[in-house]
Amino acid sequence: MNCKKQSLLPVLICTMFLLICFGAIAQDSLVIPLWQNGAPGFENRKNEPEEAKDWWVKNINNPSLTFFRAPQSIATGAAVIICPGGGHRTLVFNAEGADAAKFMNSIGINAFVLKYRLFREENTVYTMENTKQDVFRAMRLVRSLAKEYKIDTARIGVMGFSAGGELAGWLSYHYQENHFIKNDAIDALSARPSFQILIYPGPLVVPDSVSVTAPTTFLLAANDDTCCSPPVITLLQMHRKAKVPVEVHLYEQGSHGFNMGKRSLLNSLHSWPQRLADWLNDSGISKCCK
């Protein structure tokens, strides 16, 4: 009898492990459409399938947020919308979306990865304005979900990589603009992020000027990134002029697209997310407010 019980023990442990894993996967895969009936003006494209291969996703016609919930035991109440890069032609959803979200979860921050419409994709029907509508709607939508997901509305930020950094910057520096087609209760909410994180942001991120009401900002790039280190330097100068808090990390090497540093052979880049974690803590963003 004892032998039978012992033989069942590994099976029970394995079953419990699988249940935990599948529960985590189900939680990670919670997809929230930005508009229940599809993007305004493009409702008929809502059910067109996305294309995904290896590291990219494209043909996004029903923009959405994928919610990654921080473990309840360490949840701080903060949240961030993550905009992956991809040159507005594709989305680097895993390396610049899901990986970033899981890191945020590890330090107690809820994360929403944005799938936005791509205005440079081949044969696209979308414009830059449609892309802006997506990121503005995303911020307002997260605000509308704050009570349900136990999010502190004073600590909702935006993070972007490369082209996604341009979206984050459009939101942070132009949050007072509307960028919606039809009004509903969600569109009445503020689009202003409480903080922004720009990782090798594209050149379209740079505004004409930085307002004193712009959010506190974390900037990071490699100096040998000829595309996307210049915007970081320019934004630093603009933030200093406006006296808006900013922290900058400019690495000697790394070029473009090192993502969360996982595959980098450079120690400095491999550990860059820890610099972000330090800043989030020092800024009071990731400090628990239970």
What are these regions (language model features)?
Residues Q27-I74:
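N-terminal cap/lid segment of alpha/beta-hydrolase-fold proteins
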Residues V92-F93, R117-Y149, K262-L269:
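Catalytic nucleophile-loop/oxyanion-hole region of alpha/beta-hydrolase
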Residues K243-K290:
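C-terminal catalytic histidine-bearing segment of alpha/beta-hydrolase fold enzymes
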